[in-house]
Amino acid sequence: MSRNSYIQQSSDIQAAGGLVPMVIEQSARGERAYDIYSRLLKERVIFLVGPVEDYMANLVVAQMLFLEAENPDKDIHLYINSPGGSVTAGMSIYDTMQFIKPDVSTICIGQACSMGAFLLAAGAKGKRHCLPNSRVMIHQPLGGFQGQATDIEIHAQEILNIKARLNELLAYHTGQDLETIKRDTERDNFMSASRAAEYGLIDSVYDKRQLAS
């Protein structure tokens, strides 16, 4: 694929009120300008920042599929700084992480709460990390519905089904038993980076990057 195929995120970030730095690459054919996120995508770095919702999830999924097509044997690095969000949007990212061939390494920068914490834990074993002052929070899914009594009952059962499934997956990825997960997600459960490592949500706390000599 050509370099023009790299997904551009700058317009979305600018719409949110931010300025996106540009980087200039020199080559035999001259100079080429990239927004910083497109340049990092070339290094197989994806950012999951802000609330997890359908549009953002679609961008993350598209980038993972693109990087798999580029090189199915090289790790993808997913940087997470998210308060959580939609379960269905988050599960589309989760399922893609499990589906594609490359390992997805997850790194928490800032916070990984709710669905953000779930996706952090869903990274490849041995490749899930937090920076030292990151915060992680797990809890049960939230939801609300208005309507007829029967419809409310249907939606209440659905959110209980989702809760049970998320607990099962969290138990699988952390190594905790299901009863522990049920108890610990009953209310907002905040953890430091070191506590998240002890719990099994991540594998290690990054302090300094290990550079190749």
Curated annotation (Swiss-Prot):
The lineage of its organism: Bacteria, Pseudomonadati, Pseudomonadota, Gammaproteobacteria, Pseudomonadales. PROSITE patterns: CLP_PROTEASE_HIS, CLP_PROTEASE_SER. It comes from Pseudomonas putida (strain W619). This is ATP-dependent Clp protease proteolytic subunit. GO terms for cellular component: cytoplasm; endopeptidase Clp complex. It catalyses: Hydrolysis of proteins to small peptides in the presence of ATP and magnesium. alpha-casein is the usual test substrate. In the absence of ATP, only oligopeptides shorter than five residues are hydrolyzed (such as succinyl-Leu-Tyr-|-NHMec, and Leu-Tyr-Leu-|-Tyr-Trp, in which cleavage of the -Tyr-|-Leu- and -Tyr-|-Trp bonds also occurs). One of its GO terms (molecular function) is serine-type endopeptidase activity. The active site is at S114, H139. Cleaves peptides in various proteins in a process that requires ATP hydrolysis. Has a chymotrypsin-like activity. Plays a major role in the degradation of misfolded proteins. The gene is clpP. Coiled coil: none annotated. Its EC number is 3.4.21.92. InterPro entries: ClpP (IPR001907), ClpP/crotonase-like_dom_sf (IPR029045), ClpP/TepA (IPR023562), ClpP_His_AS (IPR033135), ClpP_Ser_AS (IPR018215).
